[in-house]
Amino acid sequence: MLKLSDLLALVHGEFKVIVHKLHDVPHTLGGGVNGVFWEDVAVDNMIVSRITHVNNILVIEVFEDL
């Protein structure tokens, strides 16, 4: 399980990071970068469901690992 710092090392450039906690587990998981899938990344014991970035803002959506 990767940590957030490991994930950010894969992302080139300077980013402001926003972690958005989802109230419900999303229906679909998937996506990734450089062979790393979002569901394989942990943010403080939470699982990442989606990562998007716009204008150097990295938005990380997470939900609790039940």
Residues covered by each model-derived region:
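Detector for the mature cores of small, proteolytically processed
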Residues: 19-66
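N-terminal acidic leader/helix
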Residues: 2-24
